[in-house]
Amino acid sequence: MDDPGHDNEFPDLSSFDDESSVISTRGLEAFGRKVTTTAAHLIAPRADPASNPTYQTAMTEVHRQLRRPGLQRSMFSMARTTPTDMVRSRLSTKEIQSRALAYVPDELLQNIPDGDSSYSLFQGFQASFPDFTEEGKKHRRRVSRGRKLLDEGPTIPDGTPESVQRLKKEKASMMHQFEMLGIRKNMASSEIREIDAKMENLAGMRRIILERLATLEQDEAILEHDIVEVEGRLEEAQELANEAGELAHTPKSEDDAASEKGDTPGFMSQSVYEKLPSVGSTSSKKKPRSIRRKTMPILHEHFEPGTMIRSMRAHHDSITALDFDAPFGLMVTAAMDDAVRVWDLNAGRCIGVLEGHTASVRTLQVEDNFLATGSMDATIRLWDLSKAHYDPQGSQFGKDDEDDEDAIAFENPDDHPVDPPAGSMSDCPLFTLEAHLDEITALHFRNNVLVSGSADKTLRQWDLEKGRCVQTLDVMWAAAQASALSTSDSTWRQTSRAPDTAADFVGALQVFESALACGTADGMVRLWDLRSGQVSRSLVGHTGPVTCLQFDDVHLVTGSLDRSIRIWDLRTGSSTTPLRTTTPITSMMFDTRRIVCAAGEDVVKVYDKVEGRHWDCGAGAVETEQEREPAVVERVRIRDGYMVEGRQDGIVGVWTC
């Protein structure tokens, strides 16, 4: 049996040649002895009383820690760089953890960026650490109070070593605080620059998303236009199918049978022509279909208030009336040049010109796809804008191939308006209402009821289904009756009316079911009941002609030439004056948040009902490089924060409000 003492001996390496020896023999022998001794203790049986369980316990703990991936990576990295540390280690768990966690490989150190800051990371932490806790703030206050107490304590005579040492310490402390303040100032400046860079990046991202939203809304408008067209064609096809079914089930008469056999000599006589259905009569009997928008644009809601969306020259003369159905929808403008133009606000393009009136249009209203216009020729015309031959995808109108110049968007407001091809609005006229004796100055319609006011001092109620007048209201008689009840002088007098201003007798009106509000030149606002044809209430407060009004469920807002806007409470009849101007008010409208009015200036006056503040919006409030001053605003309309204003020079501006 071999001697067990020879089991731990290494073979004699001196027999190998020097050329074949690769590593040092002495180091290998030392490493071998350590491994052999450690293995002997670890592999020794547990029942052996000579074996020490300390190594087994240590290896169990080390094995549990070494199974962590992060610790293994650190150990392998440390073994590659400093293998002698692994040999010197006593296999202590805390020692191995400390070495593995505290060691940073060179690969990570090489990736540290070179900063251009004047202070180090530790200095920044040291300068900002007191601000993180309340204890740091209390410590600074205690130091400040301690200095005051030291200053108030017994004085040390100058020139002594104690005073010099004290002053040095105080100077060192102050210099340290001064250095920390400088570091904090640099840190604050760096944070501001970082915030500015982030804000710039966010602003760029916002612009990109706004462009994407604009593209989506344009595609949505085009698709909605196609859907409406398909729905119209489907409805016509369904009507034709129903008519064909009715004709198939209708028995033929003797005359029809004889005409089919050709027995009568006058096969295509005049009587037969009279029996044939007329295409024009069939289309005229067809009830117009109201088309409501399926979605509402929201692009303008993401712009700052007072941002100009578009400016275009709509007419050669002053704007007399304008209205639009929805943001980025259809707009109709009228001017003193007797032209009535229809616009696509999404593209800034003129769709067509409405022809029929023989004089200037003074008032108009757009509701869904219907348009009502009142003219100085004493007539009211109804139009269906959905029948316009217009292609929103490009510059083509209908199916005709025209030049692109016929439908350009007027980016330069000084450009002259280009007339679209003739006949693009030929199918839009519905019918004409004729009964007034003088020019139409105000109108409003809702559902099948239209009320118009004229310079003949009457109001007329119209049934749009039958196309006829159903009631006439005499404003002069109502004014005389009210005057007779209040004073012996029954003569109607125009109060506070400028001698050089010809105010309209009926300045504004609005109808809702059987309720009618009318503002006249005597400064009165009368509330009519259309069921009885009588004035139910008169609102007195304006000292000049009423030029504009609008009401909702609770409030009525009026504008007058007396340079004031009044808000009336319909429940109590009381009024407030939130806005006064220096010039007469010619146009006014409000939405859920704002009241806008045109008051003879180059800006639109805006009153925020929620915040209770006033501000100006328009070309006059924006610094531009134009050589000439903006013209006076004559008409203004607003819907959901989307405002359109028309000026005396024929330019129409579109703004966010």
Swiss-Prot record:
Keyword Membrane: yes
Bias (Basic and acidic residues): 249-263
Subcellular location: Mitochondrion outer membrane
Signal sequence residues: none
Coiled-coil regions listed: 211-249
Membrane topology: Peripheral membrane protein
Region Disordered, residue ranges: 245-293
An annotated GO cellular component: mitochondrial outer membrane
Main location: mitochondrion
Membrane-traversing stretches: none
WD repeats: 314-355, 356-393, 435-474, 495-538, 541-578, 580-617, 626-657
Compositional bias (Basic residues): 284-293
Keywords from the named record: Coiled coil, Membrane, Mitochondrion, Mitochondrion outer membrane, Repeat, WD repeat
Alphabetical list of InterPro entries matching this protein: G-protein_beta_WD-40_rep, WD40/YVTN_repeat-like_dom_sf, WD40_repeat_CS, WD40_repeat_dom_sf, WD40_rpt
Alphabetized PROSITE patterns for the sequence: WD_REPEATS_1, WD_REPEATS_2, WD_REPEATS_REGION
Protein purpose: Involved in mitochondrial fission. Acts as an adapter protein required to form mitochondrial fission complexes. Formation of these complexes is required to promote constriction and fission of the mitochondrial compartment at a late step in mitochondrial division.
Similarity remark: Belongs to the WD repeat MDV1/CAF4 family.
Protein name as it appears in the record: Mitochondrial division protein 1
